[in-house]
From Swiss-Prot:
The gene is TSC22D1. Transcriptional repressor. Plays a role in the repression of hematopoietic precursor cell growth. Promotes IL2 deprivation-induced apoptosis in T-lymphocytes, via repression of TSC22D3/GILZ transcription and activation of the caspase cascade. Positively regulates cell death in response to TGFB3 during mammary gland involution. This is TSC22 domain family protein 1. Residues 109-144 are annotated as: Disordered. It is found in: Cytoplasm; Nucleus; Mitochondrion.
Length: 144
C-alpha cells in the first residue's frame, strides 16, 4: 500500500521538476534572468502552459509505452512459467517411473552416490559391479 502512495508522489515530483526545468530552459532561451518575471507576462504564461501540456503528453506517452512493455514482459514470463511447470511435472513423472522400475539395490546405490557427492556411473548400468569393458582395438570391428 505504501508503494502505491509513493509512486504518484514521485510522479508528481518528476512533473514538478520537468516543469521547473522547462520554465528555466524557456527563460534562458528568451534571455531573461528571472523566470518568475517572465511568467507574469500573459503571452509567456501561455507558452509555459503549452510547454507543460507537451510535457504531460510526453510523460503520458512514455507511461503508456512502459505499461505496454511491462504487459508484454509479464505475458512472456507467464508463458515461461507455464512451460517450466509442464516440464517439472514431466520430470516428476519420469522420476516416479524410474523409482518404481529401479531395484532396491539400485536405489541404495543412488542414495549413497547422492550422499558422497560422486556423479552417477554412466558407463555401466546401475547395479552392475563389473568394470567397464575395454575398448575394442582398431581394425577388429565392432564386437557384441
Amino acid at each position: 500500500m505504501k508503494a502505491q502512495w509513493c509512486r504518484p508522489v514521485a510522479m508528481d515530483l518528476g512533473v514538478y521538476q520537468l516543469r521547473h526545468f522547462s520554465i528555466s530552459f524557456l527563460s534562458s532561451l528568451l534571455g531573461t534572468e528571472n523566470a518568475s518575471v517572465r511568467l507574469d507576462n500573459s503571452s509567456s504564461g501561455a507558452s509555459v502552459v503549452a510547454i507543460d501540456n507537451k510535457i504531460e503528453q510526453a510523460m503520458d506517452l512514455v507511461k503508456s509505452h512502459l505499461m505496454y512493455a511491462v504487459r508484454e514482459e509479464v505475458e512472456v514470463l507467464k508463458e515461461q512459467i507455464k512451460e517450466l511447470i509442464e516440464k517439472n511435472s514431466q520430470l516428476e513423472q519420469e522420476n516416479n517411473l524410474l523409482k518404481t522400475l529401479a531395484s532396491p539395490e539400485q536405489l541404495a546405490q543412488f542414495q549413497a552416490q547422492l550422499q558422497t557427492g560422486s556423479p552417477p556411473a554412466t558407463t555401466q548400468p546401475q547395479g552392475s559391479t563389473q568394470p567397464p569393458a575395454q575398448p575394442a582395438s582398431q581394425g577388429s570391428g565392432p564386437t557384441a
